[in-house]
Amino acid sequence: MQLTSFTDYGLRALIYMASLPEGRMTSISEVTDVYGVSRNHMVKIINQLSRAGYVTAVRGKNGGIRLGKPASAIRIGDVVRELEPLSLVNCSSEFCHITPACRLKQALSKAVQSFLMELDNYTLADLVEENQPLYKLLLVE
């Protein structure tokens, strides 16, 4: 299973914010500069993360974005569920004549659930805390 770039960059944005000193705000422009992704794409990602409560956006002169909850409270599986369309096959009976007897969708559904359950074992904090090589790559100290 390959995650979409939307989910990939959503996770990267959260990793960047979690790597910053506690309470430090960043900007969408700063995140896009770090990862080389388009600003428009990142705005859409941050908006969805904000609606889900993972990111807090503050407007104004001293505004910016930061994590909306502690990194230890953000499970990676939950973020993927929020950002990723998880339908692996299109099982519409008008497109596939074996749909009434097909067991593939059930098998794939179980595989996706196993994937997400494994990701639920990790929090954002698990990915960033005391990760000096990551901080150096992100130029965060």
UniProtKB/Swiss-Prot annotation:
Domain HTH rrf2-type, by residue range, is 2-129
Question: Which residues does [2Fe-2S] cluster bind?
Answer: C91, C96, C102
- Its transmembrane ranges are none
Single GO BP term: negative regulation of DNA-templated transcription
UniProt keywords (A-Z) are:
2Fe-2S, DNA-binding, Iron, Iron-sulfur, Metal-binding, Repressor, Transcription, Transcription regulation
NCBIfam families listed in its UniProt record: PRK11014.1, rrf2_super
Database matches in HAMAP family: HTH_type_NsrR
Protein name per Swiss-Prot or TrEMBL:
HTH-type transcriptional repressor NsrR
Q: Which organism is it from?
A: Escherichia fergusonii (strain ATCC 35469 / DSM 13698 / CCUG 18766 / IAM 14443 / JCM 21226 / LMG 7866 / NBRC 102419 / NCTC 12128 / CDC 0568-73)
This protein's encoding gene: nsrR
